[in-house]
């Protein structure tokens, strides 16, 4: 059995790490490189960086900090933000990123997933999916351009359909960003995760809602996700990564102890 992964998420805007609640009202957390270094030293298995306004601004992720992160950490990291071409991806990987993640550009042009997977290998192509639960209809819908709330839009895709589509096109991993839970810290949406897990045959990463160590345990034990991504509980030092991993190990979760 592969070890479950703990993945801090760093949302980047204007060269700094920020964090919002339900993708709105972002506050500045701190500088990118020191935070990345801290999480690596605490025992994170991987880091994910989202340049949250790159796609909505029509630009690619700012590459200047990518190489600096690569110099100071020795764990894999994934970068996302406005990657719309093979050239964009090649540059970011050449600066030291281990994986690239695409979200809004994949919705605009799904063939991008296949072209990236063919060129760089499925193992480094992650598709991020921003999913919103509509309580009125009881359905999960994929959103686009979520980094800028004034431009966010609901797509025609239902989440479960899009999860299956991106796998057909070559996604090597899926990060499910559950927008209703984002930053609220009241737990992952286990019901949605279980439904997605049934149709997701590549590694699945849960994102949005972690507030306690038990929330991580529930995601691994009840929804069988491969990794759990979180931001505010780590940024605000509510949960220490080393202590979290020790707790999960005592609960029988296969985890890399540092």
Swiss-Prot record:
Subcellular location per the Swiss-Prot or TrEMBL entry: Cytoplasm
At the top of the EC hierarchy, this enzyme's class is: lyase
Q: Please name the NCBIfam families in this protein's record.
A: hisF
| Activity sensitivity to pH | Optimum pH is 8-9.
What InterPro entries does the record point to? Aldolase_TIM, His_biosynth, HisF, IGPS_HisA/HisF, RibuloseP-bd_barrel
What PANTHER family does its record include? IMIDAZOLE GLYCEROL PHOSPHATE SYNTHASE HISHF, IMIDAZOLE GLYCEROL PHOSPHATE SYNTHASE SUBUNIT HISF/H IGP SYNTHASE SUBUNIT HISF/H
Job of this protein: IGPS catalyzes the conversion of PRFAR and glutamine to IGP, AICAR and glutamate. The HisF subunit catalyzes the cyclization activity that produces IGP and AICAR from PRFAR using the ammonia provided by the HisH subunit.
Q: Which GO terms describe its biological process?
A: L-histidine biosynthetic process
What Gene Ontology cellular component terms go with this record? cytosol; imidazoleglycerol-phosphate synthase complex
| Originating organism | Escherichia coli (strain K12)
Q: What is its EC number?
A: 4.3.2.10
Q: What is the lineage of its organism?
A: Bacteria, Pseudomonadati, Pseudomonadota, Gammaproteobacteria, Enterobacterales
Q: What is its main location?
A: cytoplasm
- Oligomer and partners: Heterodimer of HisH and HisF.
The record, for SUPFAM superfamilies, names: Ribulose-phoshate binding barrel
Q: What is this protein called?
A: Imidazole glycerol phosphate synthase subunit HisF
A Pfam family per the record: His_biosynth
Effect after changing residue 123 to R: Loss of IGP synthase activity. Weak HisH activity in vitro
What reaction does this catalyse? 5-[(5-phospho-1-deoxy-D-ribulos-1-ylimino)methylamino]-1-(5-phospho-beta-D-ribosyl)imidazole-4-carboxamide + L-glutamine = D-erythro-1-(imidazol-4-yl)glycerol 3-phosphate + 5-amino-1-(5-phospho-beta-D-ribosyl)imidazole-4-carboxamide + L-glutamate + H(+)
């Amino acid at each position: 059995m592969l070890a479950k992964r703990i993945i801090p998420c760093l949302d980047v805007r204007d060269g700094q790490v920020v964090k919002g609640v339900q993708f709105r009202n972002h506050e500045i957390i701190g500088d990118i490189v020191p935070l990345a270094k801290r999480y690596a030293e605490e025992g994170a298995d991987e880091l994910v960086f989202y340049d949250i306004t790159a796609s909505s601004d029509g630009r690619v992720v700012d590459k200047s900090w990518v190489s600096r992160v690569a110099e100071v950490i020795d764990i894999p990291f994934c970068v996302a933000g406005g990657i719309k071409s093979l050239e964009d991806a090649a540059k970011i990987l050449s600066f030291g990123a281990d994986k690239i993640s695409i979200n809004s550009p994949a919705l605009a042009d799904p063939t991008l997933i296949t072209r990236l997977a063919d060129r760089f290998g499925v193992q480094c192509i992650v598709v991020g999916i921003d999913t919103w639960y509509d309580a009125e209809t009881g359905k999960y819908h994929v959103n686009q351009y979520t980094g800028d709330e004034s431009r966010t839009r609901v797509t025609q895709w239902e989440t479960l359909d899009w999860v299956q589509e991106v796998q057909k096109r070559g996604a090597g991993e899926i990060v499910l960003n559950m927008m209703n839970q984002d930053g609220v810290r009241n737990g992952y949406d286990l019901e949605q995760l279980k439904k997605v897990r049934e149709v997701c045959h590549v590694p699945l990463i849960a994102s949005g809602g972690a507030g306690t160590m038990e929330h991580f345990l529930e995601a691994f034990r009840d929804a069988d996700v491969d990794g759990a991504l979180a931001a505010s509980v780590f940024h605000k030092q509510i949960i220490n990564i080393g202590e979290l991993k020790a707790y999960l190990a005592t609960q029988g979760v296969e985890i890399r102890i540092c």
